C-alpha cells in the first residue's frame, strides 16, 4: 500500500512538471509579438497604387513603439520618413522597393532637440528610451533612390538589414537637417549592388561620431565604407567588388565565366581571356575604406579587391589586424593597399596580399606620419620589400 501511494505521488509530480513546461511554451507557440502595430492590419485603400501610404498609417499608429512588417513585396513610390520614434521590426524577406525617383526610400529622424545633451518630453520628463531600432528587411533603392538615412537619435541599433542598389548611398548616418546622432550600433548590415549603372555611389557613409559597426559586408558600391566625424569603431567589416559585370556583358554571362575560371587552372591564357572582357563596372576608381575625420579604429577589417584598399585623409586612424587582397580574376591591374593623404596612421598586425602581381603596399603625400608594427606583406609588385622599408622607417614624418 505504501509503495502504491509513493508511485502515485511520483506520477503526479511528473504531470505537474509537464504542465509547467506547456504553460511556459504557450506564448511562443501562439507567436506572441511585442509589436504595437503590424503592417498587415493597414491594407491599401481604394485608389492607392503603392504601399507608401499604408506604411505611413502604420508608423503613425506605433509612435514610440514597434511596427512589425511581415514578409512581402512592397512598392514605395514616395519617401518614408519616421519622426515619431517608431522602431521597425521587419521580416528578412520584407522587400521595400523604390518605384520612383526620390532622395531616400526610408529616413529615420526623430523629432526633438537631439543636439542638446538631454531630451525632454513636453511635460518636463526626461526622455531616455535608448532601445530604438531598425531591424531586418531588404531596403532596395532600385537605382532610383538611396536606401536608408539615419539621423537624430541618442543611441540607435541597426541590425540584420539588407541595402540593395542605392543610387547615391546605401546607408547614410548624418546630422540631416539640424539633427544629431551618436552611438549607432550597427551589426550584420549587408549592402550590395546587383544592377548596372550605379558607379560612383557609396555603400555606407558615417558622417557622425562615436558609432560602432560590426560584421558589415559591402559589395559593389564604388566606395565601400566612408567614415567621417570622429572616434568611430569598425570591427570585421568586409568590402569587396566585382559581381556587377563589365560593360557589354550580362550578370549571368559574367557569373558563369567567373565560375568557369575558378574551376580550371589560372594560367596566362585564362588571365588574358578574363582581362579581354574588361573591368567590372563598380571597380573603376573603387575605394574599400575611405577614412576621414579623427581617431577612427578599424579592427579585423578586410579590403578585398579595390583600386584603393584604405584611403586615409587627415586626422588620426588605427588599422589593427586588417587585411588587403586583390582578386586577379576581377581584372584590376592597378591597386594600392594604403593611400595616405594626411594625419597619423598606426598599422599593426595587418596582412597584405597582392594577388595580381601589380599591387603597391603604401603611397603617401602631404603631412603624414606612419607607425608600422609587425605586419605581413607578400605578392604584388614586391610588397614584401616595401614592407621591410616601411618597418625600417617606422615613425617617420613625410
Place the predicted regions along the sequence by residue.
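Short glycine/acidic-rich loop motifs that flank beta-strands on beta-rich extracellular proteins
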Residues: 77-79, 92, 97-103, 142-148, ...
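Parallel beta-helix/beta-solenoid
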Residues: 87-89, 108-166, 182
